[in-house]
Amino acid sequence: MASLRFIEIFPALDALEGLVHAFILKHPEIDVVTERETALKRLEEHHHTQLATLGIDRDHLATGDQVHGKIVVCCDPLGGAVNTLHHQTDGLATTTVGQFLGVFVADCGAVFIADPVKRACALVHSGKKGSELGITSEAISLMKRQYGCNPADLIVQIAPCIRPPMYELSL
């Protein structure tokens, strides 16, 4: 496996059999202080390289376009995993083996949710607005409703994000 220099793996999720997860870190040489679309274009090669390092087929990567809302969608396609952009979506969930989920975050939090019993997982983009709207609760409710998950079985991991004392927040 290539270098994991720009990848963070979380021990609580790494302990779960069959779950591949990662938080791709910012590359210090890529300038992202610009418009969103330009920044995403600049990051594209870096992200593809990191996905390949993890053995993730980007043709099987579902993503949302992060609108700071509370919509969570199931990404369980018929006929196999697909590369899909889910518009107006901040959360994704699946039970499909080989279906990868991705969200982009800058200062917002990425919340990983995994159910080792039902072998379901979700990934949400949760900034201030999404947190106030209850996006993580929405994802858990969807997992309970669609996959029969018991909230007591869930492992939840919050990725690095802005927070006190480094930033003043009013939640």
Give the role of each language-model region.
Residues 1-171:
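Active-site microenvironment for binding and transforming phosphate-containing groups
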